[in-house]
Amino acid sequence: MNELARLSSEIGTDVLTISQGMGLDSRIGPQFLRAGVGYGGSCFPKDTIALLNLAKRHGVNLSILEKVREVNATQPLWFLEQLHKQMPDLYGKRIALLGLAFKPDTDDIREAPSLTIMDALQRSGAQIVAYDPVASNHVKELFPDAEYTSTPEAVFQGAHAALLVTEWKECVELDWAKIMEMMEVPLLFDGRNAWPARGSGIFLSGGWKKLTTPLQESWLFLLAR
């Protein structure tokens, strides 16, 4: 689905509609058909490596599984490429990250996409401000120069862009009218297809393209929606 999301972003289609259509086929089902910034944790990375090593020992080429790992490894960087397209020079820009754990309801940051994203942002000279309800202290050991907030709303203050990396409930259910006023530039990147896209008065349906609302000029960049 992540590769289809990349294609969808180029041709203006809705990857959610594609996944819903695929999920209607009983041979496939709707589970695990969600595009995003990539999986992490201790299970999928470890298990896929173990299976590949087993196959290699027996002379079997698991090319699809190798591609899965390749796409997953590059997905966070592809996500950041969309930010660079709108803001080529990130030096000194205040970039907000919402969610640091590899998934909601855990403080596990092993193989978390947020780490790849933060490393790339740091190399670009961006000022990183991040929020996670339970994982911030773990990430702070790796990125001590980043700023960490105690509330999700606080990361938006003066931000030039905001990236949803982990779809914690408190990172999704926000007062968007207030958020728009807090940001220096209302540039939003949804890495989990979790932020509202329709009916809020702030966001319009669309994809990786500039959107204009009746209230103010703002942008919502959903993951190939």
Label each region the model flagged.
Residues 1-216, 223-225:
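Structural/interface elements that position substrates and couple domains in central-metabolism enzymes
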